[in-house]
Amino acid sequence: MNNQFKLKNKKIKPVSILIILFVGFLFLISLIGFIFTSFYTIDLKLAIFFEKGFKYEIVRYWSIFYDILGTTELMVFILFNIMVLIESWFLLKSKTKKDNFWKKNKWILKLVYITVYVVFVVIKCITTYFKINADNGFGYGGDAIYLLSSKYRNICLIVSLVIHCIGLFVGFYIIHYKFKNDPIYLVDKYWIQAVKILFIVLISYTILVLLKGMTSRPYYYNIIYGDLLKQVKLNGHNDWVDHYLNQSTFKHGFNIGDNKYANNIPGEWPWYRINGGLFRPDKNLVQFKHWFDWAFPSGHIGATLIVGCTFFYFLTNNQKLTPLKITLLALYFLHLVSMSFAIVVNRGHWVSDITFTYLWLLPLIFLTHFFNSFFKFKDIGCKKY
């Protein structure tokens, strides 16, 4: 098998030009936004402005659903890409003239699909079960992160579970019964796209975790946690606040010396301010268990952009765009915009968290994709057996 590569001599398609223009526009907006929100006063004013939408019932459900979705959706698409690689391996082995183990035992592939799906559903159901009504500081019935009833989180968890299980099933069906029937499935096509996406996942999440751990930036709700607790009391939920003050596991605010972590965090917290020391956050501020739990940069946007890679790579890869594919891409772009606003509205991420994520992840995705556009591997799965 020859792994040499050579330059492709092909013109850039109109759809690629449109994508480049869209990405360029998104990058430019993010750059401008990041420059302005590097001033903490502007970042804070935007957080205060967007927070106003969280008082509306429908906005709460939308925002919390996206917050939950952003932490889980990527795994579904990682499994898609892994199965593309496995499918490609089986397809390559089954096309050879010689009999081999894989050609004689094609049932193994279906077993892999079934096993992966069942394991995913079981794990997802178990984790969702334990997350429903789980205590995160307010005890049963309250949510110490959103400062609301836990019903919002519970409903969104269930909806997310259903969507993921259905989505994974549909995706596996398409990969196994649709994509593999493409006559050039193995020729510089789906398996290469899967490798690119998994590469982006590895690099991007390494960067994300390191930056989050280094800066340990609090979320907006952590900064104003004292005010939020007062509002919860005014809304008649003294029991939630009392429960929070009498527990020591969850620390969402600032510790003034009483170990309650029930006050606003003083000072300014722009994205470039290090909380305590590198990977050593101040013990008097909000505490999280993992590096990736902190605010800067946004893992939600990172995950959603990588999901977009899967849509873009697989729907436009050497194929004509159909109305259905255009619709799916348009829906994805709406999803991306929706995610960008939702995680600000619920007092979570700062605008600077989001704009910065676009600034470094878009170039990584762009360079990874267009490196493959100019170089191609020869003789990988393209023999006629």
Swiss-Prot record:
Superkingdom of origin: Bacteria
Q: Where in the cell is it found?
A: Membrane
Keywords for the protein's UniProt record, in alphabetical order: Membrane, Transmembrane, Transmembrane helix
Q: Which InterPro entries match?
A: P_Acid_Pase_2/haloperoxidase
The record's section on Pfam families has:
PAP2
| Record-annotated membrane-spanning stretches | 17-37, 72-92, 107-127, 155-175, 191-211, 295-315, 326-346, 354-374
| Membrane topology value | Multi-pass membrane protein
Gene Ontology annotations for the cellular component aspect, listed alphabetically: membrane
Q: What is this protein called?
A: Uncharacterized protein MCAP_0865
Question: Which classification does the entry list for the species?
Answer: Bacteria, Bacillati, Mycoplasmatota, Mollicutes, Mycoplasmataceae
